[in-house]
Design a protein with these regions (language model features):
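Aromatic-lined, polymer-binding surfaces characteristic
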Residues: 1-170
Length: 170
């Protein structure tokens, strides 16, 4: 993937206004990166410094940048990244988790507080405040909760481990 990703334009099947590169939509890129960030964290110390640099420089950083900002003239990803919607939750979880794995504070901050890092326009913290009712009901509905809740849980666990001062579960 580290050799392939830099060569990719938009996926040839363009069924989405938010197209991906590896997959037909950016949502799938985000889901893939969430799972891959977990795997990368597990094997990080088994890789040489050169391998880590190659993977991070050619795959993870460009993918995180793409998820946040898009590519070329298509900046729909930035709008999605800052939305109050499960697609944005997957995106912020992906960028934040790979940010933790790569020790990229800039990615973690954008994931937590939105592209502008103010928390006023987007970000995981804002999603936690707006996508759940006061009684804890997920606004997109129970019928969708199994898919949409997972990035909240896995990213919150990462936040709790890396930034316990945020008291994410409180």
């Amino acid at each position: 993937y580290a050799r392939l990703y830099p060569t990719l334009g938009f996926h040839p099947v363009s069924l989405s206004p938010v197209p991906g590169r590896l997959f037909w939509q950016t949502l799938n890129e985000s889901v893939w990166l969430v799972h891959t960030a977990v795997a990368y964290d597990c094997i990080y110390h088994t890789l040489s410094a050169k391998q880590r640099t190659t993977i991070e420089k050619n795959l993870f950083a460009p993918m995180a940048d793409f998820i946040m900002d898009g590519m070329g003239d298509n900046h729909a990803n930035n709008k999605t990244f800052n939305k109050m919607h499960n697609h944005a939750t997957w995106a912020t979880a992906a960028v934040g988790m790979i940010g933790f794995a790569m020790n990229r504070e800039d990615y973690v901050n954008k994931a937590l507080y939105g592209s502008d890092e103010t928390g006023k326009r987007g970000g995981f913290i804002r999603q936690m405040d707006y996508l759940f009712s006061p009684d804890g009901y997920f606004t997109e509905g129970a019928y969708y909760q199994r898919y949409a809740i997972w990035p909240f849980v896995i990213f919150a666990q990462c936040i709790e481990n890396k930034l316990p001062e945020l008291e994410i579960f409180s």
